Amino acid sequence: MGKYQSSKVFDGFSTVFRQWKATDTHCRFVHGYGISFKVYFEGELDDRNWVWDFGGMKRAKTLIDGMQPKAWMDYMFDHTMIIAEDDPELQAFKHMETAGVAQVRVIPATGAEKF
């Protein structure tokens, strides 16, 4: 029998970032986005005719940076500030985190296309 597919959208994430290399546009400034993810699952149907138990996301065996997938999405994108590791103002953003006014996440590069 063929494989079946289902999908789930995880949304409601609010994050900000800036593209500091975009020096000639407003994208160089910190700006926010509503982020969502659409995850696809493929496999055989189980005895309930499900490809995936969406409630099982919290029990997923595959981890991202040591976290369950949904916990990782929350950690990375729920009211956070995403900063590129080569941003010349990185220390200023880290200071904001130390001061308790931002949850900073440092990644190799920023941009909606990079997530």
Model-found features: residue ranges?
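Charge-rich, low-complexity N-terminal segments
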Residues: 1-115
